[in-house]
């Protein structure tokens, strides 16, 4: 800031000999510390004292106007605490003002004599605004102080139109008035609304920070009262050394009749002296220059809201109430047991019923992070060994039965209502029961847990939901031909190993007959996993896991139960041959192949083989070709959503297999006799080699359909296409008749039945073509009908050779996979149920149940031939992948058929009536993407 000076006060200026009131403006970075003014060096001491008092009263009210940035300077003869006098020097460059403004400025600056005409407007600005208000002064003091006849400081009040109305009163005794009476006497007036004329806004001095001192010795002294407000004015000017825009505040002038009349009572939050409160500066911000005492000490009488303004900026904003979070956190850490997922109330609060709240509903900030992770902690859905299973773990021992849950997963035995809890939280299903714990005071002892685990199915499932890799004993499975065969129960953390066929039959004999050949293992009479939830969720990604159930023993000529090399869970990676670490993503693999498969599937890499897609993938060369390695992972049945299992233990596996196996007869020479022995093991059981539903599918299979093609005539494009259309019409009628006999199809709405047939008739026809070509000619030709068989030569001569090559891929896949008739029948039904409208079906629930039932039948059909967990899972992957690939293949047939139908007259091709109706009504919709294909695997 530019230092402004005034003339020496000792030089006589007028005829009366009165000293000139030329004040000296001090530098902006200086402030006085509230010390007593030293005696002026003028010859007229009483007049100087009176002038200083009046100037203090005028300066205390000057900042009260929000638009007034003029900070008056004190007199030029004032001395600082260090004893250095400030001699004022005139400023010749300041413009002169008119006499009336000069008189007003002189009156406001406590000029002891009449104003001179040659002084600038800044000469009448005392610097008393930089000192704290006196005991009797308030913030409501007027900016333009009138002069009483008894006070020779000023002869008349200001005439500035922006000034407030002034009252006649003496300003001399203001310094001696007691506290609390400021503004009741001669020193009261309204707030000034703007700066005086003649002073440009750019030349107005800026206020100082509340805690910044201009004097060297003032930093160590504590101010008795806060000085001027250290806030930013409306114009945007901030004090030097202040925290900046964080401490924004605008002192408001007193309004209303009281301010106009001169009475300005202190605000409720103001100090006793009338000074407005200064916001407390946050200690986390850079401290301004000044004493720490002034920075930290709030103004006397200030409300906490005003003094701790900055503290609210750093308070963390939580999504829930602090009381609720505190009670919730304490309850989660201290709860010992929980009942149905409800939470215990905080200490000292009455319990009340409420909707159970899951731990996942609360943000991470509500739970304290564990400083030291516990070795015995495990996830609520993790794998552990209940004591009732009687399977000793070689690696963990008894520790697996005594593990305690993580603190944030525990819950209390009661429910409660928190005051700060959101009222609209949805009621969530209860959490599964926790595992038995060995900690002092936690849960029941191991014996009680073991008794609960081995209890009957009438009791709660309890710890039976949490099981290790295999379970030795279980309840009989549900009866019926459509019983599910899950790999694991929802909530279970491991893959369940079922009994073999004979063992399943024997265990089910106590409860009743079961028509299924290989029944899955039951757990505490818990309902088996329905495929409606597991298969139809997210594009059916988890359907292959149930194949791990079909691990059956192979009998040979030995006295003890022996299992083939394929049936045992081996500790060899099925991808590269390295040592396997566990069952990852549904397949027994090593850690390297597990990580590779996860990264390859999540990253959606498009690997390309540099060879012929037959690279060797072993422990040494597994990194050479990622394309062949990924292909081998998919062929083995690895699924990205598969659950991970614990490390295999050979002793545990052998004991489990011995427990579930039944003694086999001695001296059986071949496999056929062993199979017959297993079937006739229990005469009371109605055990069949083929499930009844598959037998029913065989019985309703349509008869051979002829195309009526005349093979005596040479093939032409029109005659060949016309014969194929006639064959398609007959096959379409056959599909309608077959679907009416299909179990469960008539339960659907009639519109849904028509829609499914119209969407899938082409898929069913080409799938039947592939099956006939595979069975009758071993996939060497296209066997459309007994009277219409196209070899490769006839395909080349036809006009749709490329289309024939596309259809030829299906019998070649059948030959490669060696598809059985049972598998073909189940896959054919799934093709009928493989495409639905985008908006869904009218009877969507019945459709899902029907589809789930036939997926289970496909599982049973796979289990009739496959003898191991891995082979069954791999087989299911291959068959379902073939069903998914048919969508793209059939789309090419739809496009060719629609183009031929449109150009039928030009091509001289006849289309039957029913087939024409289906093509015209549905093919444009299918090709436009207005249907939803149901895929087993995500692309």
Curated annotation (Swiss-Prot):
GO molecular function: DNA binding; nuclear steroid receptor activity; sequence-specific DNA binding; steroid binding; zinc ion binding
Region AF2: start-end pairs: 693-939
Zn-finger segments (NR C4-type): 573-593, 609-633
Compositionally biased tracts (Low complexity): 15-26, 49-67, 211-230, 257-278
Family matches, as InterPro entries: NHR-like_dom_sf (IPR035500), Nucl_hrmn_rcpt_lig-bd (IPR000536), Nuclear_hormone_rcpt_NR3 (IPR050200), Nuclear_hrmn_rcpt (IPR001723), Progest_rcpt (IPR000128), Znf_hrmn_rcpt (IPR001628), Znf_NHR/GATA (IPR013088)
Gene Ontology cellular component annotations, sorted alphabetically: cytoplasm; nucleus
Post-translational modifications reported in the UniProt record: Phosphorylated on multiple serine sites. Several of these sites are hormone-dependent. Phosphorylation on Ser-303 occurs preferentially on isoform B, is highly hormone-dependent and modulates ubiquitination and sumoylation on Lys-392. Phosphorylation on Ser-303 and Ser-349 also requires induction by hormone. Basal phosphorylation on Ser-200 and Ser-404 is increased in response to progesterone and can be phosphorylated in vitro by the CDK2-A1 complex. Increased levels of phosphorylation on Ser-404 also in the presence of EGF, heregulin, IGF, PMA and FBS. Sumoylation is hormone-dependent and represses transcriptional activity. Sumoylation on all three sites is enhanced by PIAS3. Desumoylated by SENP1. Sumoylation on Lys-392, the main site of sumoylation, is repressed by ubiquitination on the same site, and modulated by phosphorylation at Ser-303.
Region annotated Disordered, chain positions: 1-302
Keyword Ubl conjugation: yes
Protein name, as recorded: Progesterone receptor
Gene name of this polypeptide: PGR
